[in-house]
C-alpha cells in the first residue's frame, strides 16, 4: 500500500498538475485513489465510451489503433508523469485508440465531472491539458505522414529521433534509449512488420548511425540518423 506522502509526490510529477500547490495535491490525492494494473491490461477500446482522464504514476502505457488488415499501429508511448484518455473528454470524441499497460503500472483516474471542477478552480490545468492534446494530435499526424511518405528505414530513423527527445539518456559513449523495444514493438510504432524492421535496423547499423548493445539502441552518429530520417538510406546501402 502506498503511503499518503508518496501519493502526493507522484501526483506532483504530473505535467498536467504542475500548477497545483502541495495542499491542493494532497486534497486531490484523497479524491482520486490509485489503481495497480498488471501488464497487458486494456484500459479502453474505441468501442467504449469512457469519460475518464488517466494519470500515469508508474510504468508505461501504449496507445494504439488497429488497421483494417489487423496490424497494430502504436500512436504513442505514455510514460510516468503523463496522462492519457484526454481525447475521450473532448466534445468530438476523437479517441479511436486502445490503451494497454506495457508493464505493471499505477494509475489514478479523474471523471469528467472531477476534471471540470478542477479546471474551474485552476484554469491553468485546462490550458495545460489543451497543450497536451495539441501535442499528441501533432504526434499522431506526424506518424501518419511518415507511414504515407517514407520508406521503413527513414520511418525507423524518425522514430528513434522521437525516442531520443522523449527518453534519451546521455552517457560517456553518447546518447542511448534506456527502454528496451522488441523489433515487433518498433514495427507497431512505424506501421511495418517485424522482419522489415530487423532489416532496416541492420541498415542503420551499417550506416554507423546506431548500435544495439544489450538490446538497447545507442546512437553513434546523430547527424547520419537525422539525414536518414529526411532522405532515407543511400542506394548503395539498400
Predicted regions and their residues:
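Cyclic nucleotide-binding regulatory domains
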Residues: 16, 41-104
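Short aromatic/basic micro-patch
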Residues: 19, 53, 77, 101, ...
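Polybasic "coupling" helices that flank or enter modular domains
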Residues: 120-191
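Cyclic nucleotide-binding regulatory module and flanking cytosolic helices
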Residues: 1-39, 88-89
Amino acid at each position: 500500500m502506498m503511503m499518503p506522502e508518496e501519493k502526493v509526490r507522484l501526483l506532483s510529477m504530473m505535467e498536467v498538475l504542475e500548477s497545483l500547490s502541495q495542499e491542493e495535491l494532497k486534497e486531490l490525492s484523497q479524491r482520486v485513489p490509485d489503481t495497480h494494473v498488471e501488464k497487458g491490461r486494456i484500459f479502453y477500446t474505441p468501442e467504449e465510451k469512457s469519460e475518464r482522464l488517466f494519470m500515469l504514476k508508474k510504468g508505461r502505457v501504449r496507445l494504439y489503433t488497429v488497421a483494417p488488415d489487423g496490424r497494430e499501429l502504436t500512436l504513442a508511448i505514455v510514460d510516468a508523469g503523463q496522462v492519457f484518455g484526454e481525447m475521450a473528454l473532448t466534445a468530438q470524441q476523437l479517441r479511436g485508440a486502445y490503451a494497454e499497460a506495457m508493464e505493471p503500472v499505477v494509475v489514478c483516474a479523474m471523471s469528467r465531472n472531477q476534471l471540470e471542477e478542477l479546471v474551474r478552480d485552476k484554469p491553468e490545468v485546462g490550458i495545460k491539458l489543451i497543450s497536451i492534446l495539441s501535442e499528441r494530435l501533432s504526434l499522431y499526424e506526424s506518424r501518419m505522414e511518415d507511414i504515407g511518405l517514407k520508406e521503413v528505414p527513414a520511418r525507423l530513423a524518425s522514430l528513434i529521433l522521437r525516442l531520443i527527445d522523449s527518453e534519451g539518456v546521455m552517457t560517456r559513449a553518447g546518447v542511448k534509449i534506456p527502454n528496451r523495444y522488441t523489433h515487433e514493438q518498433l514495427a507497431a510504432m512505424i506501421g511495418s512488420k517485424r522482419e522489415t524492421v530487423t532489416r532496416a535496423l541492420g541498415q542503420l547499423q551499417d550506416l554507423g548511425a546506431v548500435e544495439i548493445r544489450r538490446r538497447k539502441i545507442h546512437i553513434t552518429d546523430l547527424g547520419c540518423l537525422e539525414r536518414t530520417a529526411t532522405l532515407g538510406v543511400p542506394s548503395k546501402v539498400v
